[in-house]
Amino acid sequence: MSDYLLQMNGIVKSFGGVKALNGIDITVKPGECVGLCGENGAGKSTLMKVLSAVYPYGTWEGEILWDGQPLKAQSISETEAAGIVIIHQELTLVPDLSVAENIFMGHELTLPGGRMNYPAMMHRAESLMRELKVPDMNVALPVSQYGGGYQQLVEIAKALNKKARLLILDEPSSALTRSEIEVLLDIIHDLKAKGVACVYISHKLDEVAAVCDTVSVIRDGKHIATTAMADMDIPKIITQMVGREMSNLYPTEPHDVGEVIFEARHITCYDVDNPRRKRVDDVSFLLRRGEILGIAGLVGAGRTELVSALFGAYPGRYSGEVWLNGQAIDTRTPLKSIRAGVCMVPEDRKRQGIIPDLGVGQNITLAVLDSYSNMTRIDAEAELGSIDREISRMHLKTASPFLPITSLSGGNQQKAVLAKMLLTRPRVLILDEPTRGVDVGAKYEIYKLMGALAAEGVSIIMVSSELAEVLGVSDRVLVIGDGQLRGDFINHDLTQEQVLAAALSHSDAPHNNARKTA
């Protein structure tokens, strides 16, 4: 019998004559966790679709050996029956069904006569959650009543119920808090000890280093290296991913911070479901010309609600004033904000940033389409010229501006959303989690773009859950805690510990080393 549970040898997958995968080799042993790393568009998702038979046998070249035997699956159900289960970044749970019903979806236990055996499913679901160290979870409740971390565990329980021997986790922590991530990594360690193998796909290389035994890097559809994690470190992984050494993960463009041009006054946001509860409580701050202002805070602190209100996109009731260049401006709707010179790249690009049914170019010019129209027709040549310039400026990888935007990787979709907002020529640009789900190379390009925009005099407000990112690119940092301003710091020798201390504080007076900005 082979020492390997899985062997993928010489995998080649082509689309229209273009090789998306070009001779990929991957091996996984029982109880081993393999980190699969690469930039967006490198071929990670395509490789996993080959493995799980989304692309069935016969549509690709090479061989897959499972327990030493050829695997020629024609459907996902065949690979799941073999013990290969993928947990996608976008969870597949049905919100209104119970935890137990979600775990058994498609594999329901029945009584004679075909009726559902709910007691047996409840008992088995409780057993699975105990196995995952969540003994107090009420499996009879709708899964929607649990947060993202618990829902991720339900997906794992669902996979284990299918007798998974190889668990493929695609960006499993993208919507989790730090404590939920730690629970997830502990569970993966437990599964490894029981002989369950894992493929861990993530841009968060600290997680890869913490849980993986080996790391396989692919770049431009080719296998670059597979190395024991003990012989690797994060800078080496990054070098293999991008094909060059990156000495500075947070590049800075020289830029001058000028006079105050933007002011948020007494911004208060009320909860959508409970209008008496304040999600943001009387927050005021200033922003200078060419300044990059980072907004930090714990999950649920109110950061997204704050910037959504500034842009006129908060769905609930809110109050306060927004001033630009010494005058109050109308930001009650996104359109009015854009016309006033305030633009925002939202946190959830798939739901709020792109129109999936439109092409790359159409998404880029969507916010300024009227500028190409003379009431009777659209100047297609002028529009295409703008699209080509933005694609070039953003280093956006696409074979054609007419391709569906959904054909792009996450990083390139984000660049398209940025290009759309930049075509409006904003004076204030709000970025909410601009690098979430984006690979290290695309992150680097986004940071460089932010610096270049600041050098041109654009003022930037950036919300990020990654403290290292906030400290790496910001001139000044605001800290939000429980909907209130807890700190306002000039980013000079500022530490993560200082930011966290401010976020966790309950003082009425905010921590402040930036009084001279007032």
UniProtKB/Swiss-Prot annotation:
It is a peripheral membrane protein. GO terms for cellular component: plasma membrane. Pfam families: ABC_tran. GO terms for molecular function: ABC-type D-xylose transporter activity; ATP binding; ATP hydrolysis activity. Its EC number is 7.5.2.10. It is found in: Cell inner membrane. ATP binds at residues 38-45. It catalyses: D-xylose(out) + ATP + H2O = D-xylose(in) + ADP + phosphate + H(+). Residues 6-245, 262-507 form the ABC transporter domain. The keyword Disulfide bond does not apply. The keyword rRNA-binding does not apply. Belongs to the ABC transporter superfamily. Xylose importer (TC 3.A.1.2.4) family. Part of the ABC transporter complex XylFGH involved in xylose import. Responsible for energy coupling to the transport system. The complex is composed of two ATP-binding proteins (XylG), two transmembrane proteins (XylH) and a solute-binding protein (XylF). This is Xylose import ATP-binding protein XylG. It comes from Pseudomonas syringae pv. syringae (strain B728a). The lineage of its organism: Bacteria, Pseudomonadati, Pseudomonadota, Gammaproteobacteria, Pseudomonadales.
